[in-house]
Curated annotation (Swiss-Prot):
ATP binds at residues 8, 11, 91, 143, 146. This is Multifunctional CCA protein. Pfam families: HD, PolyA_pol, PolyA_pol_RNAbd. Comprises two domains: an N-terminal domain containing the nucleotidyltransferase activity and a C-terminal HD domain associated with both phosphodiesterase and phosphatase activities. Belongs to the tRNA nucleotidyltransferase/poly(A) polymerase family. Bacterial CCA-adding enzyme type 1 subfamily. Its EC number is 2.7.7.72, 3.1.3.-, 3.1.4.-. Residues 232-333 form the HD domain. CTP binds at residues 8, 11, 91, 143, 146. Monomer. Can also form homodimers and oligomers. One of its GO terms (molecular function) is phosphatase activity. Mg(2+) binds at residues 21, 23. It comes from Burkholderia ambifaria (strain MC40-6). Its cofactor is Mg(2+); Ni(2+).
């Protein structure tokens, strides 16, 4: 039995970046031998075991063969006679098809085992597929795009990009299950440069299949006096990258991605203006989230940001009553944490424009101060003093909040 560290751990070690995942392959062992040594079996489709002490995953060396369309259409072969090179050959990219032996004490020993020249591709900053079997797994399209968001200075090899296009043309991207699409998109959004993920997906044609609502944004013009970058797709990528640069949460980054979807459906005769795009964005986000089974926190923030971002940009023009109505409409009084994320998404929108990434955004501070004031009102005490009439209570609480905001912002009305 020989144990090897494989894949991302070796890649990241060579790149000098923190190792995010550690995967191990065991050559020359049977499932029974693994169990006898205290490993706990957890794999459904093929033998994967958890180490008794570290709980890290160890998989028996295996080969795989495509038997049907889609992500699950594989037949696996695992046995003590499967070699390390055979196991590495089934992997997606050369930079992920390297290994080092692990000593009984758990240390990496010996040279890097690199049968597909992954080290050369690391030096060249190139994503290159290992072999023709790459086309058998459509998830690899999404994985390469996600890696591009993490390693933003890498490019996709021409022959690899051609294979990805062939896969898309053959309908392989259509066979991807919703959960896996969302998983990879979400992980890519949380990388350092999410726009690179979408660039790769566009380049191979996959974005139009998995996120057609986003793909449709490129080529849609905006007013140059508001958007020097003009193209809506370019703007949205700048917004997402700004949110990533600030380290914002996944819900904020997803809201940044989807806030302007409605601009793709603006009638051609009114371009480059986009009156009413907020409502159209909401109507596109709803089915998108249902289709990809997007988590509720991401969906809910995306919807409120899409609907209200235009209003939020204009809050410097609002009086106290309008601000309180805005808080009530966006549920800021009950959900201040979500409202804080809404501010982050809208600030990203304002700064995700060509040459405007450092411009002041006083709207955020105005809203923070106003919200603290509005939430300081004791609605319970007011209700006890008014009586049982629900409408009277609501009106009295609203008026008290307006007065509190007036005082906090020194607004004379």
């Amino acid at each position: 039995m020989n144990i090897y560290a494989v894949g991302g751990a070796i890649r990241d070690e060579l790149l000098g970046v923190p190792v995010q995942d550690r995967d191990y392959v065991v050559v020359g062992a049977t499932p029974e031998q693994m169990v006898a040594q205290g490993f706990r079996p957890v794999g459904k489709d093929f033998p994967v075991f958890l180490h008794p002490d570290t709980q890290e995953e160890y998989a028996l060396a295996r080969t795989e063969r495509k038997t049907a369309a889609g992500y699950h259409g594989f037949q696996f072969y695992f046995a003590p006679d499967v070699t390390l090179d055979e196991d590495l050959a089934r992997r997606d990219l050369t930079i992920n098809a390297m290994a080092r032996e692990v000593s009984p004490e758990g240390a990496l020993v010996g040279p890097v085992i690199d049968p597909f020249d992954g080290q050369a591709d690391l030096r060249a900053r190139v994503f290159r597929h290992v072999g023709d079997a790459f086309v058998e797994d459509p998830v690899r399209i999404l994985r390469i795009a996600r890696f591009a968001a993490r390693f933003a200075d890498f490019t996709v090899a021409d022959d690899t990009l051609a294979l990805m296009r062939r896969m898309v043309d053959a309908g392989e991207a259509d066979a991807l299950v919703a959960e896996r699409v969302w998983q990879e998109i979400a992980r890519g959004l949380m990388e350092a440069k999410p726009s690179r993920m979408f660039a790769v997906l566009r380049e191979c044609g996959a974005l139009a299949r998995v996120l057609p609502e986003v793909d449709a944004l490129w080529g849609v013009p905006q007013r140059a006096d508001y958007h020097p970058e003009v193209d809506t797709g370019v703007h949205v990528m700048m917004v997402v990258d700004y949110a990533a640069k600030q380290g914002y949460s996944l819900p904020v980054r997803f809201a940044a991605l989807t806030h302007d979807l409605g601009k793709a459906t603006t009638p051609a005769d009114v371009l480059p203006r986009h009156v009413g795009h907020e409502g159209r964005s909401v109507e596109l986000i709803k089915p998108l989230c249902e289709r990809l089974r997007v988590p509720n926190d991401c969906r809910d923030l995306a919807l409120v940001v899409a609907r209200e971002h235009g209003n939020l940009h204009r809050v410097m023009e609002m009086g106290a009553a309008a601000l309180v109505r805005f808080f009530e409409r966006s549920d800021a009084l009950r959900k201040p944490a979500r409202f804080a994320e809404m501010l982050q998404a809208c600030e990203s929108d304002a700064r995700g424009r060509l040459g405007l990434d450092t411009q002041p955004y006083p709207q955020a501070e105005r809203l923070r101060v106003a919200l603290v004031a509005a939430r300081s009102v004791d609605a319970g005490a007011i209700a006890r003093g008014v009586g049982d009439d629900v409408m009277q209570i609501k009106d009295a609480v609203h008026r008290a909040r307006v007065e509190a905001v007036k005082q906090a912002l020194a607004i004379g009305e």
